[in-house]
Amino acid sequence: MSEQEAQAPGGRGLPPDMLAEQVELWWSQQPRRSALCFVVAVGLVAGCGAGGVALLSTTSSRSGEWRLATGTVLCLLALLVLVKQLMSSAVQDMNCIRQAHHVALLRSGGGADALVVLLSGLVLLVTGLTLAGLAAAPAPARPLAAMLSVGIALAALGSLLLLGLLLYQVGVSGHCPSICMATPSTHSGHGGHGSIFSISGQLSAGRRHETTSSIASLI
């Protein structure tokens, strides 16, 4: 019995292949959250890229400075979001990360996405407020209509991103306790099954011993 008890903990460990498969499954946890963050990233890339190209293509001598600066900022912001998505996909395909907190940071819906959305919201908000302030500063009675409208739109978009990120973080923090509470119950369930199996094994061994002794006495 002592040898069986010594071999039991070793048998409970997972083989390396199963551990590798489990690491790959870490990237696909919480699919709804991942899909939401992916949609937001695609919207940022498409919106900022299209807006930046539109401003750069309509640059003229009269309004060249602010259109050139704003279009460049929007294009760089779209490039930043795109690079983050490509980097996460490349790291996932290469399977070069074996730590859970690194996967949770880089996967879709993780900490890196929240940081990118925060940076994008701040950049859009600051750019929009700057454009609106510059449009109203020279002549408050007749501000530049295009500059003011672009500034208000960018400020509103940045505010929506920051508000959405705040609500997202509140929702994530609200779901964390329930997940943490569900994990110990799962482990306790597995422990209960293990105890049932061990008890049944001991009972079957005892019955075999009694059967053997009775046969020996009859002989």
Curated annotation (Swiss-Prot):
Localization, UniProt: Membrane
Domain of life: Eukaryota
A single GO cellular-component term on record: membrane
Membrane topology, record value: Multi-pass membrane protein
Segments traversing the membrane: 36-56, 68-88, 114-134, 147-167
Translocase is among the record's keywords: no
Keywords: Membrane, Transmembrane, Transmembrane helix
Alphabetical list of PANTHER family matching this protein: TRANSMEMBRANE PROTEIN 125
Protein name stated in the entry: Transmembrane protein 125
Organism of origin: Homo sapiens (Human)
High-level lineage: Eukaryota, Metazoa, Chordata, Craniata, Vertebrata
